[in-house]
Amino acid sequence: MTNVAIIQFPGSNTERETFMACHRVGLNPVEFLWNHPVDKLSDFDGYIIVGGFSYEDRSRAGVIAALDPILDQIKIESELGKPVLGICNGAQILVESGLVPGLNKYKIGLALTDNKRIREGQVVGVGYYNTWANLQMTAEPNSCAFTRHIKKGASFNIPLAHGEGRFVAPELLLEEIIANEQTIFRYCNDDGLIIDEFPTNPNGSIFNLAAVCNTSGNVMAMMPHPERSKNGDLIFSSMLEFIELGNPINNNSLNFDTPLIDIDNYNKNDNVEWIVEMIINDNEAVSVQNALIQKGHDVIISRHTHWEIDIDQKKSVTLSKIDKSGELYNSNKEFISKVKVARNTASYLVRQHDDIFGRAKLESLKDKFEIKEISNIKHGVIWNITVNSGNFDSTLNTILDTNILFNPLSYECYRIR
């Protein structure tokens, strides 16, 4: 019997469909929760990390789960050649953990960030999106554990449902993973044509990427949901064959060298700055704090929402209109505050490169609320780290190396103090 661990975190929600898909092809799925003893993972022949919203996508999708001790053991098992499939949120976890694409020492090489639906050069939609998507197999069948029963060039139609499914990759790394045939599935239209715009590309992924595997071919991060349709069964039957053949991995490698994280000091300009603090408990900050404590850091984490507002004229009147709109903060549970100076505390401003959320708020304020005096809005998050014990600077550097606060491929970061 081929036993596959179905790995679930708090917030996972597609385990039933995954169990059904495994049963259809002869795999024996076994529930494995995040709080089970990690050493028991070695008893399994393969692993599937299911979709959903692990830890409510706090900080960003997949990153809290990626720091869980389970992933350390999954890395060990994957190095033995065992297959690991991450679906949707599972794909985000594999990317945030560095298991995909497989850089040296599990360095982060990819990002899965907010959807951006583009047609004729214009952004026509952002955020969560669900549909049925066409996927084309663009690698040789034996290049990946999950494609052995699929012909190169074949396409199939399966469901897709996510808010952060847009693959981002450095150009040089993308060239390498293409050459290695790690770009397993790409979005195509009904005729099998790969067109880099919506609706063929449903989320703006670079190179129309829907799934990417690691260098050995035994770990795959896939955003659409093959478990939700029989159309995806060949992925699971391929996994079974791969295990039965003794895990025949590939010997590819990646030479891409991840650049060092460059964090500049934040220089405040003349624009209006709103720093929003929560009245109630900030569960997102608590989750990040707990994850760091689990990693051995004696820290306190707090968080503020940061808005930078560029106003053309009538500044005080315009700010009053923005305030009354309720678009930038909810006065029932938030208030405008400031970054507090505290001992052994560092603050970092994190922003998405594309700042999709800031642009959406700008459009809403101008179009819905007819506040035309705003020329630009930038959205960010301020993370405050208080180090209770240990060396202050080395603790900060170690925390930044976890990427828990931001993925450097899709975010920019500034040191406030």
Where are these regions (language model features)?
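Structured core elements
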Residues: 5-8, 31, 48, 86, ...
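Conserved beta-strand termini and adjacent loop/short-helix elements that scaffold enzyme active sites
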Residues: 32-34, 188, 416
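Short, well-ordered, mixed-charge alpha-helical segments that flank or form enzyme active sites
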Residues: 92-96, 102-103, 143-144, 166-169
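N-terminal beta1-alpha1 cap of cysteine-dependent amidohydrolase-like domains
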Residues: 1-101, 120-125, 129, 200, ...
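Core nucleic-acid recognition elements
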Residues: 246-417
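A short alpha->loop->secondary-structure connector
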Residues: 101-112
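Amide-donor transfer/coupling interface in amidating biosynthetic enzymes
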Residues: 76, 111-268
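Short, solvent-exposed amphipathic alpha-helical segments in soluble enzyme
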Residues: 20-24, 174-176, 227, 237-238, ...
